[in-house]
Regions:
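An acidic/histidine-cluster motif and surrounding catalytic segment
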Residues: 137
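Catalytic core of non-heme Fe(II) oxygenases with the double-stranded beta-helix
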Residues: 31-113, 123, 130, 144-151
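Glycine-rich nucleotide phosphate-binding loop and flanking beta-alpha elements
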Residues: 120
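Signature of the catalytic double-stranded beta-helix
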Residues: 1-50
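Acidic, two-metal ion nucleic-acid-processing modules in DNA metabolism proteins
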Residues: 133
Length: 154
């Protein structure tokens, strides 16, 4: 149902025009699905995923994270506080003037879908709390079947 939801929303928004994916039956969920338990000071460096589409769903987001971004000490020295936020990076990351990013402060029940190849990172927070999210990747069914066949031939 998650692949179907993504495909339906992406189609309505015109986001499937330049992809080979036309309907949800062409997407399959890759295993494993994983749970992220992030505690104070933990973070994920810039990375990307396999497959076509990645998804993250936030199950628990402590209110203290939002407070850090609106009232925290670093708000006095930064126009863009980043405590506990997720940032997607595009362009030539590391090249001045040729890259950008999109930063969100997750809320409970937020679901984000994005291209699996898109670099992203998660910033640390100071709150003595735990944030919980679930992540999954979707692959193109035909490509995944070819990959499995190739693995079997080795």
């Amino acid at each position: 149902w998650l692949a179907s939801l993504y495909t339906e929303c992406a189609s309505k928004a015109g986001r499937t025009k330049n992809t080979n994916i036309r309907k949800s039956e062409e997407l399959i969920m890759q295993k494993p699905v994983w749970v992220n338990y992030m505690k104070s000071g933990e973070w994920n460096p810039s990375h990307n995923h396999t497959g076509k589409i990645s998804c993250v769903t936030y199950l628990r987001v402590p209110k203290e994270i939002d407070d850090e971004n609106t009232k925290g000490e670093h708000t006095k020295v930064s126009n863009t506080p980043t405590a506990g936020r997720i940032e997607w990076q595009f362009g030539n990351v590391g090249m001045p003037y040729s890259s950008g990013g999109y930063i969100r402060t997750p809320k409970e029940k937020d679901i984000y879908f994005f291209p699996a190849a898109l670099s992203h990172q998660v910033y640390p927070f100071k709150a003595k709390a735990e944030r919980v999210s679930v992540s999954v990747n979707f692959a193109d069914k035909i490509e995944a079947e070819l990959d499995l066949r190739q693995l079997g031939e080795r």
